[in-house]
Amino acid sequence: MTRRQFTKVTAQSALLITTFPVKTITTQKEEKSMIRLGGPVFTRYENPDEWVNAIKLLGYRAAYCPVDITASQDEIKAYKNAAKKADIIISEVGVWNNPITSDEAERKSAIEKNIKCLQLADEIAANCCVNVSGSRNEKYWAGPHMENLSEETFDMVVEITRKIIDAVNPTHTWYTLEAMPWAFPYSADSYLKLIKAIDRKGFAVHLDPVNMVVSPEIYFNNGKMIGECFAKLGPFIKSCHAKDIIIREDIYLPHLDEVRAGTGKLNYAVFLKELGKLQDVPLMLEHLNTQEEYKSAADYIREVAKNNGIIV
């Protein structure tokens, strides 16, 4: 086509557009990512309505389980229905014991509590039941031990996790293990190894990236580690913990301290962006002493989220 022919065709097209206006095509604005933030409630509550009000006053859309394993079926049902009506997701039922302890009586009791907590999580429709895999340490129930990362311990974790899940066969929740620096799982790849070995639909991931910062290399590049976790584990993640971490600069061996969100170096921009891609996975604040500290942590997370176009 010559330039003259092009000019003629263009003029004819312009005339057609003038005579027969073309409807403007608009693209729908891309929806913003959304995260459900939650944390402990310091206000006492006696019933589901008071609990919901306490959650709403804090601006949360996720919450820890409001009852424990001693709750009646009527209580569980009432809180479950109240959460659903108020659009609050119950994030998790925490166990926090050592199911691989060498003490036979303690181990049996610990496993029984895991089963009861998983049953509660299933009945109240929490996103997950969460525990740590445990420790061979005789003094500290979740402490370091030279055998924690052995193949023997790995097999123990697999066997006991299967036993817990098979006892309940959950249909409305998942049993999850939170990462620890010196226990399975401790990285994205060790999570994948566990998922494959346990081989149960009822097993999933509870992501706490601070617990996976185990070296200066990971500390200074923790955004990369967080991205890797979501890339490899995304479909399995059911709940996350929100805290922070800082390295001591006044001593000459690596010393990492857990601190309040916003006072450390965890890459929350990456964390929130990746979490925002998932569907209704709660981000739960933890390990603080007062409601004021939780408010400061929540304010920081909301600020980072706002700066990155994420609704909290």
Enumerate the predicted regions with their spans:
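C-terminal helical cap(s) of enzyme catalytic domains, especially alpha/beta-barrels
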Residues: 294-311
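Active-site acidic/histidine proton-transfer and metal-coordination neighborhood
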Residues: 10-12, 16-18, 49, 85, ...
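Acidic (Asp/Glu)-rich catalytic clusters
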Residues: 32, 52-57, 72-92, 119-125, ...
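Hydrophobic faces of well-ordered beta-strands that scaffold small-molecule active sites
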Residues: 35-40, 63-65, 90-95, 129-131, ...
